[in-house]
Amino acid sequence: MASASTSSSNESESQSVLTWEQVSRLNDVLTEAVPVHGRGNFPTLEVRLKDIVQMVRNRLELRGIMVKDVRLNGSTASHVLVQDIGWSYKDLDVIFRVDLPREEEFQLIKDVVLSTLLDFLPEGVNKEKITPMTLKEAYVQKLVKVYTDQDRWSLISLSNNNGRNVELKFVDSIRRQFEFSVDSFQIILDSVLSYYDLSENPMSQHFHPTVVGESMYGDFVEALGHLTNKTIATKRPEEIRGGGLLKYCNLLVREFKPTDPDEFKALERYMCSRFFIDFPDIVEQQRKLEAYLQSHFIGEERNKYNYLMILRRVVNESTVCLMGHERRQTLNLISLTAFRVLAEQNAIPDVSSVTCYYQPAPYVKDLNFNNYYVASCNQSIPTWLPCN
């Protein structure tokens, strides 16, 4: 009995009922029309999150896959809880909690999601000849399936050219659902979805559903305090994967501060090591970095350079697991990416104001070395030459 009481206590500690202001922001997110952009000649779909979530859920249950609950996850959940923390939410990340005992369920889920997209095609489009494969090629940005002993989940990400992809994740089990306390929030949507089904009245301060938020970090109040005060904290850092380094630097560039700088200095070393374990090849590192910049800095182009400089500093100061040339290779990749970002912003300094200093080769110091060819020159040349 004591153990049941402890479990109940932990659950209540990790959950909290949303205020009306938070429910109102949630309603805005769920009812806003989000464009899903098609490739080639395929039309743009106007999708409201509440509609696609309801339709997918109902059709999954008709096909025998019971949905335990549906949750809003990630930066969008953080936006609902605390509106102004210096960053805008990106992907619309929704989790369907389901049982996935066999791989066959993954195919069924994909079929349901793709067939649902047909209902969002504009009137006048001939749907008869459009196959699921065609819809996948036209509208799916990313398709992921993970089926191991510890992780069973799939992700279907629908394309948005502005970086606000609709991400539908179907989760049976997953080892870790957050990296830091500020991205550990999930908002349970079932009561809101029922409200949309059953009530004809718009939500108001005096008439709205009770909505519960949960922190996977554990203590909801503590995690919300971290989000409000822009502080960085985590638990079980050994579970953080390689992408945690990129997320950590993203928080730093947005002026989040570690709760314990000394502790996080050690954690930086761990995150750098984990990054190079998960992405050992320079080509993989480049692909990962470019994908992260593309998906997390839409509309924030000027922040990219600052982010890259922070990432370079952390890698330079905290990398202990690499050979010297490997470390320099990664630092060079980050520097070149930063330079390209400046070029894209037309922010490269005027070269006329830059002075270049040339270091003589070591053998020039050798007093015995006198094998110089001296060319005659009739005009005087200044000591320092401008780069242009």
From Swiss-Prot:
Its EC number is 2.7.7.19. One of its GO terms (biological process) is mRNA stabilization. InterPro entries: TET5. This is Terminal nucleotidyltransferase 5C. GO terms for molecular function: poly(A) RNA polymerase activity; RNA binding. It is an enzyme of class 2 (transferase). GO terms for cellular component: centrosome; cytoplasm; nucleus. It catalyses: RNA(n) + ATP = RNA(n)-3'-adenine ribonucleotide + diphosphate. Belongs to the TENT family. Keywords: Cytoplasm, Cytoskeleton, Nucleotidyltransferase, Nucleus, RNA-binding, Transferase. The gene is tent5c. Catalyzes the transfer of one adenosine molecule from an ATP to an mRNA poly(A) tail bearing a 3'-OH terminal group and enhances mRNA stability and gene expression. It is found in: Nucleus; Cytoplasm; Cytoplasm, Cytoskeleton, Microtubule organizing center, Centrosome. Disulfide bonds: none annotated.
